[in-house]
């Protein structure tokens, strides 16, 4: 029997953390971060980690598990998330995956091949090469490969092509979980306003000092490439004014949010909820309760 888990995704600044904490309190759960940047110690403000008070109220996992000089990949996330979920489930609690790194979360849910003779990065690279194709083009590739997919959808097509390309058996792609995937969204103008406001709050909380520390110590590491830091480096080099750098960060974050939504819409089977609608949290909690009771 597959383990039931709750997955909360959506663009940055939409309220994933707050909802995950509420779900954890309501259903005796623990939160597993699905964010590629929150793994780094010392990068707290720019990655929008749950506050110490929030982490004290509900157990959080896969936060602060790497030094800024260390790398982190989808392989690392899947391996560590699987162990974490197993531990949470063994204690009779509900695992709640919350984050905005679509590749990591999709890798976990779809059981990406993490061993065997084919290097994991080759598989991810092949999948990435399929992403630009439209549904019709993918269907044509599937037909050319002589594959049959009942109830065609994009996810099945990409997976079938991957298996055909690398010669892997379907059984090797182990699906361990039965997820309920909730995607939070907002009206575009409202979301962008939330993003701009959050960036302002980050600066008030000390983002500039955090980014300067990273710039001074490890400007070329993977951790420094995340949105929230690299946009400020031109200011530290004297190439931009502070206001220009702040606006650059807001713009980059808005673009990132758009890419996140595109990923969740096209790559994952999600249930969308508009956070601005009346009673939306109650509807989400009701859906989760029905899912867990089923």
Curated annotation (Swiss-Prot):
Highest taxon in the source lineage: Bacteria
PANTHER family with a match to the protein in the record: TRNA DIMETHYLALLYLTRANSFERASE
A GO term for molecular function: ATP binding
Physiological role: Catalyzes the transfer of a dimethylallyl group onto the adenine at position 37 in tRNAs that read codons beginning with uridine, leading to the formation of N6-(dimethylallyl)adenosine (i(6)A).
Family assignment from sequence similarity: Belongs to the IPP transferase family.
Binding site for substrate: 12-17
GO process terms (BP): tRNA modification
Coiled-coil blocks: none
One Pfam family linked to the record: IPPT
Residue numbers marked as site, Interaction with substrate tRNA: 101, 127
Stretches the record annotates as Interaction with substrate tRNA: 35-38
Self-association and partners: Monomer.
Entry EC number(s): 2.5.1.75
Residues that coordinate or bind ATP: 10-17
Keyword line: ATP-binding, Magnesium, Nucleotide-binding, Transferase, tRNA processing
Reaction catalysis annotation: adenosine(37) in tRNA + dimethylallyl diphosphate = N(6)-dimethylallyladenosine(37) in tRNA + diphosphate
HAMAP family per record: IPP_trans
Name recorded for this polypeptide: tRNA dimethylallyltransferase
Names of the cofactor(s): Mg(2+)
